[in-house]
Design a protein with these regions (language model features):
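Short, acidic/small-residue loops that bind anionic groups at enzyme active sites
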Residues: 32-33, 123-147, 151-154, 201-208
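Short, glycine-rich nucleotide/cofactor-binding loops
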Residues: 8-18, 180
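Flexible loop/turn connectors
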Residues: 298-310
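Short, ordered loop/turn segments at secondary-structure junctions
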Residues: 10-13, 41-46, 76-77, 113-116, ...
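Short Gly/Thr/Asp-enriched flexible loops that form oxyanion-binding sites at enzyme active sites
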Residues: 20-24, 114-128, 188
Length: 358
């Protein structure tokens, strides 16, 4: 009797998705041979909702280790909308369960971030056999020390900061680099340290613009003709941190500065007189070939997930804890975010180096 394994990639793409898919497939084929069939669910949960899936040939998993993006396609399907019946009159949860049954799946592997894991847990609670795999450049999935895609994004953001140094120095400017990360500052913290940023601003540590401006002025007085700010896109001021999201987004809109980076740059320029510019690498941080580290990590996660399938161990997500690959119950991690804690070792490293955290 053959086992039918469904695989989908959901949410934003990142380096390592294809490497993980490959790890799962190769490990399954090696372990089960022709007793396993892999069904590709196209474009994330949207494909599961609308019955968009296909049988995959073993040859499709060759040559994708180094390829960025995802061969299955992906789409954001917000968790908060899963129970909402829209204008199309589709009950999304019922539709996903129907596709699972029609495709004759024995289990479903969901590669994605926090939203993906919330939906994976929902499906698990609805009785489906589900396994999650942690993907995000934000590195903010609860219960795992690292997610695939993170290290490649750190490499990319670091290179951006590296390249900004020379132009900042040549023009005696303050350069604000906006790094991805709405709720967690891991990517900004790591790339900021790796790239030699002078000021690092992350969502978990609300900044005081006076301290930011003071850090720039202190560098100028010390003979430094430029400053580099690594700013998480989700950075909040001390004042904003006291408000509800709707309040501070409205205030930003009123001021004309919709992003934290834009406002910080204008404020620093006004307060210090230093010419200030913004650099937004944006989606470059989630594109391209995965780093060697992420290829290894993705392969580890994929092979471990294949083992879970073989052992009929469902309702969990793969994780790296203290350098060991393991599995956490979906119900224990869904809906939780792994933020940068106040006692984070890398925050202490930044402080010890004289890097301002605002």
């Amino acid at each position: 009797m053959k086992i039918r394994v469904g695989i989908l990639t959901s949410g934003g793409d990142c380096p390592g998705l294809n490497a993980t898919i490959r790890g799962v497939a190769k490990a399954l084929y090696h372990r089960m041979g022709d007793k396993v069939e892999i069904i590709g669910i196209m474009n994330g949960y949207d494909g599961l909702i609308h019955g968009n899936y296909r049988m995959m040939d073993p040859s499709e998993f060759s040559g994708i280790l180094t390829v960025g993006g995802t061969i299955l396609g992906t789409k954001r399907t917000p968790f908060k909308m899963m129970r909402v019946v829209g204008e199309d009159k589709i009950d999304k949860v019922a539709a996903m369960k129907k596709t699972y049954k029609e495709a004759k799946l024995d289990c479903l592997l969901c590669l994605g971030g926090n939203g993906t894991h919330k939906t994976a847990n929902l499906l698990s609670q609805e009785g489906l056999n589900v396994i999650g795999l942690p993907k995000t450049i934000d590195n903010d999935i609860f219960g795992t020390d690292v997610t695939f895609g993170f290290h490649t994004a750190v490499d990319i953001a670091t290179e951006v900061i590296d390249r900004i140094h020379t132009t900042a120095g040549s023009h005696s400017r303050v350069m604000c680099i906006e790094i991805m990360g709405n709720k967690a500052g891991w990517l900004t913290l790591y790339s900021g340290i790796a790239g030699g940023a002078d000021i690092i601003l992350i969502p978990e540590h609300p900044y005081d613009i006076e301290k930011v401006a003071d850090a720039v002025e202190r560098r100028a007085k010390a003979g430094k003709n430029f400053s580099i700010l690594a700013v998480a896109e989700g950075a909040l001021s001390v004042e904003e941190a006291k408000m509800k999201r709707k309040e501070w987004t409205a205030k930003r809109a009123e001021s004309g500065y919709t992003t934290a980076t834009n406002r910080i740059a204008k404020q620093v320029e006004a307060m210090t007189g230093a010419e200030t510019r913004i650099c937004v690498p944006g989606h470059m941080q989630r594109g391209g070939s995965p780093s060697a580290y992420d290829r290894v990590l993705a392969t580890q996660f994929g092979a471990y997930a294949a083992g879970l399938v073989a052992d009929v161990h469902y309702g969990v997500t793969v994780a790296m804890v203290s350098r060991n690959v393991t599995a956490n119950p979906l119900i224990d991690i869904a809906g939780k975010t792994r933020n940068v804690p106040d006692d984070c070792a890398m925050l202490n490293v930044a402080r010890s180096m004289g890097i301002s955290l605002g």
